[in-house]
Amino acid sequence: MNNEINNELNEIEVNDAETSDIFEEEVNLARSESREQAFMLLFSKSFDDEPLEETIDDNSEMFVGGVCAYAQAVVSGIEDKHEEIDEIIASHLKKGWTLSRISKPSLAILRLAIYEMKYLDNVPQSVSINEAVELAKKYTIDESKFV
């Protein structure tokens, strides 16, 4: 599944310059911490339909110094490209599987990794994949193999 997704994403040349600029400006947080914030926001957002700004405000107390700009930009980008990202995931599921069968943490991790690989030209795909696996090991039970 990973090879198929990688091949599909390699064929697409899309650059989200605004998110890339914010990513470069993130000096206070390690990239993995920024991704973890983005994951936590995505996971939290999966439980309600409130606007993204409210999700960020509601969760900003969890993070020392608030939510970083990179996490906000990535989650906003994922929200904008939600249908396209979910189509990519769904197209690689086994027969009979739907997105609703995937746990919320695993789905948030997959969305984050696919967004980075498809829309951010300054993040190597190998880094996105590795970070996704690390998040899955930390936040899922026996589902890290799925990611």
What are these regions (language model features)?
Residues 1-146:
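N-terminal interaction/assembly modules
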